[in-house]
Structure formats: structure tokens, C-alpha cells
Amino acid sequence: MTLKRFSLFARNIHLPKKTNAASVESNGSLAPTDEELEVINSLPPFQHALQLSSQSATKAKRSYLETKLPKVQKLFKSSRDPAYLAYDFPQGLSNPYVDAHARPVTNPVTGDTKYRGTPRLSVTKLLTKRWCELRETYDIYSRIPIFEHSQVKQGRKEHQRLEEEVHAPPANIEEFEANFEVDIPDDPFHSLVEDWYLSIVRLVTLFQKGQAREILCHGYLSSRTSGFVRGKVKDDNDVLVSGIIDHLILRQRRAKNNVPSSLTQVLSESVDINLAQFLNLLPSLVQQASKDFEIVVSDVKTRSTKTIPRQQTVVKASKMQVMYYRFLLEDLGRDAETTYQKLLINAQRRGFNVDQPINPAKIINLLEIDPMIRGDMERLQRGDQLGFKPFDSEAELNTSQPVYTLEEFDEKITDLRTRQKYETLFTTWNTPVTLRYFAARLALMYENVGPLLSQNLMIEYYCGDVNFHNISFSFDAEELERQSFDSAQFWFGKRAIEPIKPNMKNLQTYCKYCDYESVCLWRKEGRQACKTLGQELVRLYNGNSPNAITRE
């Protein structure tokens, strides 16, 4: 268990019927040939770049750069200075989302669209100016994952530690999964099932214990308007944007600290949660608590030293990231029926059939992780309604589903403990368990989060296991709208690349940490301009000085 400038719709992007198909071969438009790689590698700046990297980088990083730099050089080779990388989009490839990220291919006969890339964006992908947008562009078009250095690996461990402090895995879950007598699927479809279920469980923990970690959120960005979609998703050209929220804190509004607080004492003392009963009770509790409690959205940043980043673009991007999370969570919390639809489209955009029955072994596995949906499973077994209209209506209409049965478990499972807990479920069910069920329950959980969302946001900085500094700030809807529009304009090829301002401070601060430092034409021209400006200022100063006049 683990825990240019063409509009997008002009490229005939549709809801994918198939995704990431191995049978689709790349046309090679972005991939250099062996001969091209040899020529590129022989260019003096590239030899210099690789020599520099060999002095300070690890063997893994050197290998990484030797693969990435030639690919970028092939696409961005400057016509004015061929040894350097240009700072505009490659000719005919000016839509980063279509040309480098999603890379759709439409079958001219069937009209089916397949993707050689990823037909969605993440919140972090929207932060194109967190460092330098030109560097981001080169990385996007290289189609090579960002190098994972030791600090990133350490940060992931720290996130996992924080997650398990709040959401400790059941003590015997690994043993159960290893010894269960039926194979438990762990393919992408069933991984999504588990992810949605864990988000449900963790949001219950939020109201019970006052905090939750690693919560899914998502929304849709219009490739036509470059704005986020409000309400139902109606356009196949609306691009899925997903994120994972590091930390949600339920606290008293007038509190001077971030101490988590249960919504009510009754919830904090509850041990065995029945999800259906919990959801029936929760709306009234949220309404009563809305004046006194708030949910703060926070992001965790790990650092190798007890310092915060000096670069203002980095801090600003971190704030924007949390604002995105808060915005998406608020949107999901407006109306459960609309959110239900958005969740189903989310799954479809990933290539999944929302009516595909979930493997019964996975259901038993989820019940072992947390049994709060046991009552719901028994309702589906009997064919009873859940009490959520969109789901119940679809269940009544969908009569062509295959038989959903756990009868074979009666023969396969001999473990007495497992049989004692679950054998009443080993029958044929009237309603199959599909992604629709988890979408319905997760949508209702989001709806109860929305009313409590705070305008106060936070970034938590950790060094090791020490939370050494927090930055508190306010949600700014107008700024978020400006930034998201600007980012969408970039991703959908509706504006030019906007590198860092080429002043000496930026060129020294940002460029020295960049993989493209020695082959970047923007940096080269910026340094030349700064040098020329300095010489001109000296000339002007000397020309206007009294001593200069006397000499003349």
C-alpha cells in the first residue's frame, strides 16, 4: 500500500477514449538522431557545460545532463548563435501543452485520440515562473523528468513521516495483504480507487482530530479562455489540473496558534465510524461550527538548512501553490452533485471506465485499511439506495452491468479471521462497486470542507523533523486569477516565454543553479548588455566629472 499560439481546441483534442497506448509510435519530431546528438555534443559550449558538470555533479547527474542537454539543443538551437539555446519556442511547436506535454495523436479513421504524453497538468506545473520560465520551458520540451537529487529524496521521506504521524497505517495491513488468499490488484485503476478512499478517510480524520495530510484536489483549466472552469465541465478542451494538499488544519478562528481541534468532542471520541451516518450528521455540525472554526490550507517545504529561500520568485510561487490548493478545494466544496461529475471526468481523463466493477479483493483490502464503508458495502450488496441522488439514479438506470459477486471467496478464503469478518459479503451483490460510489462519497466530504475554508493560508518550513519557520498569508483571489491566466496563456501557446529579467543580480542568483547556464543565449546576451551598460555609465560619469572637463 502506498500511501504558435494555436488554441488547443484547434488541435482536435477530445476526451480520451484510450490513453498512453504503447502501440502508438512517436514520429520522432522531438527526438534527436544519433548523428544529431554527436554534432550537438561536439559544440564548444556543450563540451564546456559537460566539463563543468563533471567537476561538481555526481555521476548520475552527469549522465542525466548528457541525455537532456542535446535534446534541448536540437529543438532550441539559436539561428543567430547556433552554439546557444534560443529563448523563444521552436518553430511549429509553440504550444507546450499540446506539442511537448500531452502530445495527442488522432486516428484519422476512427477519430480516437491517444496520448503519447500526459493529458493533464499538476498545480506545480502551473508555477512556470517559480524559478525561470525559460528553464521550465527547456525542461518541458526535453520530456525528461527533473533530476531527483538527495535533498528531494530526503524531502519525500519527511513528508511521509509527517503523513504517518497523522494517518498511521493499520498495524497488520502489510501482513494481511501479504497473506490474503486472493491477489489484490495494484494497477493504476485500483490505485485511483485507493487514493480516493484514502482521501475520504483522511477528511474524516480532519473533522475528528483536527488535521489531515496528503489530500487530493483538482479542477479544470479552459484552453479557450485560459481561466478555471466554474460549475460543471462541459468542454472536452478543459484540461484537468490536479494537486495534493500537504496539510489541512481545523482550528478555532480566534486561536493564536495552529493547534488542531476536533469539530466536536463527540467526533473526537468516536472510534468506529460508519461513513453513511457520519455524512448524515456532518452538515449540521459544520453549520454550527462555521463561526468558531476554520480550515487552514498549508504546504510543507523541506530545507537542508534552517533558512528560507532568498529568491522572491520561489517564495511567491510557494504562496501561489497554496492559493491554487485553496481555490480548488473551495470549488470542490460548493456543490456535491457538480463535484461528483468533476470526479468522474477526472477518472475518464485518466483513461478509466467509471462503470468498471472494482475487483472484490480490493474492496476487502480497503475494508481492512478502514472499515468505515462496511455499512455502504452492505447497502450495495442488498441493492439499497445510498441517499445521493446522482448515484442512486444512475444505479437504477444501469441495468446492463455484469454480475458482481464475491461467492468465489467462500471457497478460496480459508483464513478463519478473514472469514469471520467478511463472509457475510461472500454473495452476489445487487449493485456493483464502481468508481461512482467513491466519487459520490468523496464529493459529499468535499462539500462539508468548503464552508469552513479560511482566508488564512500557510507555508511550513522543515529542516529534518523540526518545523523551524512558518509563513502566514491571506488568500488573494484576484492575484490567483491573474497568475493562473498568465500560466494558461503560456501552456496553451498564447504568449511568448518570459525569462527572468536580465539584470546582473538575477543572472548571478538564478543562472548559477541552472542546467543550461553555459548554453543559454538569454544569459549570454544579458551579461553582455550589463557589461556594456556598465562601460557606458563609466564613460558618462567620466565625461561629466570636473577632472574630465579640465583635461579637455
UniProtKB/Swiss-Prot annotation:
<keyword id="KW-0269">Exonuclease</keyword>
<keyword id="KW-0378">Hydrolase</keyword>
<protein>
    <recommendedName>
        <fullName>Exonuclease V, mitochondrial</fullName>
        <ecNumber>3.1.-.-</ecNumber>
    </recommendedName>
</protein>
<feature type="binding site">
    <location>
        <position position="132"/>
    </location>
    <ligand>
        <name>[4Fe-4S] cluster</name>
    </ligand>
</feature>
<dbReference type="GO" id="GO:0003677">
    <property type="term" value="F:DNA binding"/>
</dbReference>
<feature type="binding site">
    <location>
        <position position="511"/>
    </location>
    <ligand>
        <name>[4Fe-4S] cluster</name>
    </ligand>
</feature>
<dbReference type="GO" id="GO:0005739">
    <property type="term" value="C:mitochondrion"/>
</dbReference>
<dbReference type="GO" id="GO:0036297">
    <property type="term" value="P:interstrand cross-link repair"/>
</dbReference>
<dbReference type="GO" id="GO:0046872">
    <property type="term" value="F:metal ion binding"/>
</dbReference>
<dbReference type="GO" id="GO:0005634">
    <property type="term" value="C:nucleus"/>
</dbReference>
<dbReference type="GO" id="GO:0051539">
    <property type="term" value="F:4 iron, 4 sulfur cluster binding"/>
</dbReference>
<comment type="function">
    <text>Single strand DNA specific 5'exonuclease involved in mitochondrial DNA replication and recombination. Releases dinucleotides as main products of catalysis. Has the capacity to slide across 5'double-stranded DNA or 5'RNA sequences and resumes cutting two nucleotides downstream of the double-stranded-to-single-stranded junction or RNA-to-DNA junction, respectively.</text>
</comment>
<dbReference type="Pfam" id="PF09810">
    <property type="entry name" value="Exo5"/>
</dbReference>
<keyword id="KW-0460">Magnesium</keyword>
<keyword id="KW-0238">DNA-binding</keyword>
<dbReference type="GO" id="GO:0045145">
    <property type="term" value="F:single-stranded DNA 5'-3' DNA exonuclease activity"/>
</dbReference>
<keyword id="KW-0479">Metal-binding</keyword>
<keyword id="KW-0496">Mitochondrion</keyword>
<comment type="similarity">
    <text>Belongs to the EXO5 family.</text>
</comment>
<keyword id="KW-0408">Iron</keyword>
<comment type="subunit">
    <text>Monomer.</text>
</comment>
<keyword id="KW-0540">Nuclease</keyword>
<feature type="binding site">
    <location>
        <position position="514"/>
    </location>
    <ligand>
        <name>[4Fe-4S] cluster</name>
    </ligand>
</feature>
<keyword id="KW-0004">4Fe-4S</keyword>
<feature type="binding site">
    <location>
        <position position="520"/>
    </location>
    <ligand>
        <name>[4Fe-4S] cluster</name>
    </ligand>
</feature>
<keyword id="KW-0411">Iron-sulfur</keyword>
<dbReference type="InterPro" id="IPR019190">
    <property type="entry name" value="EXOV"/>
</dbReference>
<keyword id="KW-0809">Transit peptide</keyword>
